[in-house]
Amino acid sequence: MTNSNPTAESVVLTVSELARACHVTEAWIIERVDTGLIDVDTAGGPTRWRFVDTHLSRVRCMVSMERQMDANPELAALVADLVEQVRQLRGRLKGIG
């Protein structure tokens, strides 16, 4: 899973904003954070959680897998991990070639 921390260049979203951007409920986000499928600093509870652009991509991928492929949350998270790894490897290959 991607461990992302907000930086000056990052888009920073609250639970509510992330849920709206991904067309899911806040409870959907909270459940996946609580089960470790979305990695975020959980100090202070959901009202203090902050998500960055990599979280947005991950959650959108997970939502897509769950809705379109009827994947369970764990499988959707695994697919999101693999998509991110492929993205990183492609970036490395571009740097080499």
Regions picked out by a protein language model, each given a short descriptive name:
Residues 2-16, 20, 26-30, 34-97:
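Arg/Lys-rich, alpha-helical DNA-contact motif
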